[in-house]
């Protein structure tokens, strides 16, 4: 059974500088499907991705070999620099190199960010899609 974790919703959003509807990410871990689904909203920064990765590592059902679908379609802005991409790939990423990863994008900027992550990972098992259904089908193969 999948468990949905909404980051920061338990905290007072205004105390963290967020409006109540501006939660940076929510994720669910489905151990039966061996899959993690993360939805980023508002803006994506290296700090928000690191926070997601830390929460995910602490989840008792998470395994680094699970597949992942990263849904970027609701993000308004991606604030990542070249050194952020390197840090994400080398230090923050909680998944093993063998894990299948799918990015679901809506804009060219989201597509470029996903492509950068794919380039920096040692194995080329990251794909980019425009629909959630295509991404899920590919990850589950």
Regions found by a protein language model. Give the residues of each.
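Amphipathic, Lys/Arg-enriched alpha-helical "gate/interface" segment within cytosolic domains
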Residues: 2-141
């Amino acid at each position: 059974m999948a468990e949905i974790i909404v980051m920061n919703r338990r905290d007072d959003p205004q105390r963290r500088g967020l409006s109540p509807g501006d939660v940076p990410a929510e994720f669910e871990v489905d151990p039966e499907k061996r899959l993690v689904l993360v939805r980023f909203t508002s803006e994506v920064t290296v700090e928000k991705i690191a926070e997601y990765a830390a929460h995910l590592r602490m989840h008792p059902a998470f395994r680094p070999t699970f597949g992942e679908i990263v849904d970027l379609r609701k993000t308004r802005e991606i604030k990542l620099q070249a050194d952020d991409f390197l840090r994400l790939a080398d230090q923050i990423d909680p998944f093993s190199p063998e894990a299948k990863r799918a990015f679901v994008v809506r804009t060219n900027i989201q597509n470029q960010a996903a492509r950068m992550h794919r380039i920096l990972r040692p194995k080329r098992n990251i794909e980019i899609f425009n629909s959630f259904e295509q991404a899920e089908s590919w990850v589950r193969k």
